[in-house]
Amino acid sequence: MKFVDEAFVRVEAGNGGHGCLSFRREKFIPRGGPDGGDGGDGGSVYFVADKSVNTLVEFRYQRLLRAQNGQPGMGRLRSGKKGEDLIVPVPLGTTVYDKETSELIGDLIEAGDKLCVARGGRHGLGNTHFKSSTNRAPRRTTSGEEGEARELKLELKLLADVGLLGLPNAGKSTFIHAVSKATPKIADYPFTTLYPHLGVVRVEEYRSFVIADIPGLIEGASEGAGLGVQFLKHLERTQLLLHIVDIAPLDGSDPVQSIQAIISELEQFSQNLSQKPRWLVFNKIDLLPPDVAQARCQEIINRLNWKGPVYKISAIKRQGTELLCYDLMSFLETNQRSI
């Protein structure tokens, strides 16, 4: 499914209903007083975080969201009906900005989070309100106020616990497919993953975490090379980064240079992102004899002066992936999510 991480939409709240100009007209009461009712408030537009929604794709086909207007007041002191609020479900992790001012309106993180993005107009008053000792038959009413209207920018950052880093063809898509139910497109050419993928890794019945696979980076991405760094923002809310490294690249490239290229792109994109906990995961160890694979991994560790956690896996054969997933689960449970 194509992933949409940005959308633009116009929201219009309902206008308030006008107040009513009316007088009592009943038999034997020739000069009845004012009985004009108030209008109804206009409906508001709300965004609600819904865990059953996972993209912003619907907003590509529905660019205008409009709540109902309030009904006008009526005689016999009857108020107009309030306009119905418009409740719009959005994915967890949606950030809402005012398109014109870039003002942050709100962030919808947890299921059920509710955000008013356009407030309905207040109702108008009927002529009953303007009766006084000197004016027994007021002909004055007020109009309902216009509802708020604004252009919005919606941005979706994936709410994943673990993010995958790596150059194209490092095996990230194969890894997420091996450990979760995600089914990203997998092939042997750069940029196979053109849109972010989420996978749920379930290590036991009630122990699971979410992992995000984003398009592979290449050196110079921050200058626009390859797919650029536009998808790196999806990793900003993760607690941990897994750096997938191909230790047997078919093009003969140097894994150390590949790792350093990724680190450089991270630092250029965001200092906070570059300082997140990061584990090295050496992939495709099945393509080398065990002693050669061990020696190559150790060489990379030494050249990088790497002090962090290291794992050796074969994603395609699911070798070493179970231990890695259990260790990830333990790390996440020890370090509670804080967004």
From Swiss-Prot:
Main location: cytoplasm
Pfam families linked to this entry: GTP1_OBG, MMR_HSR1
Enzyme Commission identifier(s): 3.6.5.-
Keywords: Cytoplasm, GTP-binding, Hydrolase, Magnesium, Metal-binding, Nucleotide-binding
GO biological process, one term: ribosome biogenesis
Sequence positions that bind Mg(2+): 173, 193
Residues involved in GTP binding: 166-173, 191-195, 213-216, 283-286, 314-316
Cofactor(s) essential for the protein: Mg(2+)
OBG-type G domain segment(s): 160-333
Segments forming domain Obg: 1-159
Keyword Hydrolase in record: yes
GO molecular function: GTP binding; GTPase activity; magnesium ion binding
GO terms under cellular component: cytoplasm
Protein's cellular compartments: Cytoplasm
Region span, Disordered: 127-147
Keyword flag Ribosomal protein: no
Subunit structure comment from the entry: Monomer.
Entry function: An essential GTPase which binds GTP, GDP and possibly (p)ppGpp with moderate affinity, with high nucleotide exchange rates and a fairly low GTP hydrolysis rate. Plays a role in control of the cell cycle, stress response, ribosome biogenesis and in those bacteria that undergo differentiation, in morphogenesis control.
Family the UniProt entry places it in: Belongs to the TRAFAC class OBG-HflX-like GTPase superfamily. OBG GTPase family.
Name of the protein in its database record: GTPase Obg
Gene name of the encoded protein: obg
